[in-house]
Amino acid sequence: MEHTGEMDNELAQQPTTPEGASGVARKDAPEQVLADTNEGSPDDAPEQQPGASTPDDATRPTVIVMHASVGSGHRSAANAVAQALELLRDDPSLRDGVPCPEDLNVEVLDVLDFGRMRMNGDKMASMFTGPTRPIYDLTWRYTLTGRLLWAGGTAWSRIMFPRFTEHVRKTKPLAIVCTHITAANVAVGARMITGQSFPIVCVPTDYETEGMWPHLHSDLFCVANESMAETLRPRKVPEERIAITGIPARPAFRKTYDKAAGREKFGLPQDKRIVLALAGAYLPTPYVRFREALDKMLPYLHRFKNTHLVIVAGADAEYAAHLRRECEELGIPNATVLEYVEGMAELMAASDLVICKPGGLTVTECLCAKAPMILLGRAYGQENINVRMLTSLGAALHVTTARELVGAMGHVDANPAIVEAMLTQGSFLRRPNAAIDIARNALRLAAAEPSTDAHMRKKHFLHFYWGHTPAHIR
């Protein structure tokens, strides 16, 4: 699960508004800021926001897409799947033979809104980005990832989330799609308690599967790549319950953009290498060191005559003003500072290289936009796995300090072919239609006969089991 890397091109640079540019209205939490994307184009979302409810919803067949607001990546993935479900509902030509109710209702829910105690996902995310990061790294890598494994149970639902169980009892969903482990476990518990037979689809939003997913009580895992499937097989997840779909990105990242037109739109030079730094921060803590490294790199930008740096500061006007002062004082002509950007997918597609943190949704969007990456900062937990996966394939460079960042940019400046090589290697992971594929799988399962696997439907409070030797060393 990814808690930290998505605060740059999601809520990271979003202005505080009741709905956001193309966000999803979350039932049961109208008072919260709902902005989820920096993609402000009306073409990127249906006129009716996905998940928005109407008085008739109670009588319509419903698919629930559930996330946890710990960071913004899980929410962004949930929104992408919800938009894909609505697209399939409204355009039968995209269904590929999968049945879909014409009056399908899609609910996008934050599982934390159903807790006995009100939980602040942003504060929870800080545990994974502050001084406790090494502890989190150990727990993420080693908790129930060996031979002793977690299957699922009702504990989460009975102790913390009985309200969601009642919502499921009333709604009787066709299916539940979960982009966070808490959501998945609560969905499994609700199904056990209510005795319903709807399928549960798990969608990890990083490039490895952690140990707390309800492995034996989920109907399908939609994973990013074959390596994740290799992780699930020794955990006794049957092959027919694994689909390699990719990580769901927003609709804007399914589009193809003209690079020259994009540069003209954002006022960027056509004859330079555009390096885009995603430095916006909805939660500032994870980006303190990231921004410090960018600040220290600025004085060396004079060296790279063929490079034009674009820094996105998001909704942080104070940080944007600081960057502009620095560039002016240093006399840097080859830099542009942007605040809130409408059309982030187009901006990324207009760039040759992106400097970013290694969050699952961030790197997925870079892959979809065909933008090679320099991953900046020490990586822990799921971000460490993302770094290892991307660098091992040659799809990204990884640096941890400003000195290494300057060196990497110099290396790219002296060897431009590196960028093209990273782009080629990244194409093996690029799956811009992941959200559509996940939506099709969810609808296919919803239309099929319920599973007759007695073990998957059996009630447990806490269900642990023994697996085979893990496929990957953590």
Role assignments for model-derived ranges:
Residues 77, 92, 139-236, 241-244:
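Active-site and donor-binding regions of nucleotide-sugar-utilizing enzymes
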Residues 79-171:
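Conserved N-terminal ligand/cofactor-binding loop architecture of enzyme catalytic domains
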Residues 261, 269-350:
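Donor-nucleotide binding loops and adjacent catalytic segments primarily
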Residues 349-359:
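Acidic donor-binding loop of glycosyltransferase active sites
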Residues 351-352, 370-372:
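A short alpha->beta transition loop at the rim of the catalytic pocket in nucleotide-sugar-dependent
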Residues 393, 400-417:
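C-terminal "capping" alpha-helix adjacent to the active site of nucleotide-linked donor transferases
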